[in-house]
Amino acid sequence: MSSTLAESWERYAATSKPRRATNGRGESTWLNWTQYADHGPDETVLGPVAGRKVLELGSGSGDNLAHLVTLGASGVGIDVAPSREAVARKRWGGLPGVEFRTAEAVAFLEGATEEFDVVLSIFGAVWFTAPDTLMPLVRGRMSLGGVLAFSHLPPGSQELQPGKAGMRHDHTPDEWRSLLVGHGFSDVRVSLIDPPEAKTAGTMLIRAQAA
């Protein structure tokens, strides 16, 4: 793992705020695809998760993955920042069926032997790793018919600081469709989720099946 990459994400982690104890519906666990609280679709994007093995690329504090595990999934969450694993373990380590590891996505997938039914990335590794590098590895660790889903900002919705443009892999819906089909996925669906009132940046949500 690149120490520079880990250090960069550690700095980001230091600025992140813990998720609220309950959401607007009074739930103590939930999955959120967007950058806004109580906004956008829920885990039903993934289909039924009970009995399925889930991998989250960029699991952060583990809240989204833990929610899926409460619904009957088993899950592995990886994050490149060591402090994120520590936070996730502290909050969710007592939940049966969930595991958190410190790892960079490409390195983890290259060494993995497990097969996953669901892979998700919410503003995570899919956005920050070249698709031609990452997607063959993701597909290689997925069961036939498995679900890949990920979200990030739509292309061009945020101006990047000088020197950081290459850190994010922004693609249009058509580009994502072509990339995913080319790397062994089918039934690619791209949704553009409008932001809440008074906000300007929406969310792009992509779902595909391992063919």
Residue ranges and their predicted role:
Residues 186, 192-211:
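Core SAM-dependent methyltransferase catalytic element
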Residues 55, 60-108:
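Class I SAM-dependent methyltransferase SAM/SAH-binding core
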Residues 48-49, 113, 135:
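A short, aliphatic-rich alpha-helical micro-motif
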